[in-house]
């Protein structure tokens, strides 16, 4: 495996991701921001943050698979969420949990969540991008 995830001593341990990803592979995969579209370009879960997060993670998994990667190869995840407030974390994590169940894995790469005013299409509440490293 080209990625080793750790929580170093001196930094808080976060349940849903690791603080550091050590990449030893030779190929880097950059996944464009994935929104909650299905394969036909139709928005999934309009107005429902959990449903959109779930679809975004499923789309990231599809993109990773096309490159021969999985979430185990992810070195960094970044989520952009419209009108973010901390009280929406439970909805966000519900979507992550549902996607993880469907995928049979829990994304644990270092992650950043950024609140934004808007995304490209008004129905989109979240966009998630990934960087993965392969041997």
What are these regions (language model features)?
Residues 1-58, 62-76, 82-135:
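N-terminal presequence-like segments and the immediate start of the first folded domain
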């Amino acid at each position: 495996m080209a990625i080793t995830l750790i929580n170093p001593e001196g930094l808080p341990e976060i349940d849903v991701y690791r603080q550091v990803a050590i990449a030893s592979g030779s190929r880097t995969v950059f996944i464009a921001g994935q929104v909650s579209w299905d394969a036909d370009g139709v928005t999934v879960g309009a107005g429902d943050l959990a449903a959109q997060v779930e679809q975004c993670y499923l789309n990231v998994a599809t993109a990773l698979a096309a490159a021969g990667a999985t979430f185990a190869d992810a070195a960094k995840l970044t989520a952009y969420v419209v009108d973010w407030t901390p009280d929406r974390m439970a909805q966000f994590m519900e979507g992550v949990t549902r996607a993880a169940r469907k995928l049979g894995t829990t994304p644990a790469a270092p992650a950043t969540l950024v609140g934004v005013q808007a995304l490209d299409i008004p129905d989109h509440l979240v966009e998630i991008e990934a960087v993965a490293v392969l041997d």
